[in-house]
């Protein structure tokens, strides 16, 4: 996971995560692999009190982009969220808003975020918030 996300952290697309954080949160991650090589991943951080969850660190390897791995990760994250009883998932992004809009997400104000997440929101980063209702 670290090797996959590191280039995107370096260019500012993703927020930096260290090995300790990823290891601590490994159960939150969904991966797509081919022959043992990880080509896509995303983490789901639930906010059960708000019946929503944050999909974070959605990353697809450049070699795999356009081949449906991002869609597969999204579907798996949605399935996990539904199994947890969540009614929506949200993402914070600075660059890939069109990808999310094409997949049923809608932009909302950062004030929409659950209080626990709002307290950690980095206003300097100016991330846009997108939400998708799960059916």
Show where each model-derived region lies.
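Short loop/turn motifs at secondary-structure junctions and domain boundaries
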Residues: 20-26
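A generic "binding-loop/recognition-motif" signal
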Residues: 95-96
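Short amphipathic alpha-helix that is part of the acyltransferase structural core
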Residues: 1-17, 33-34, 126-129, 133-135
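Conserved beta-strand in the GNAT
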Residues: 31, 37-46, 52-59
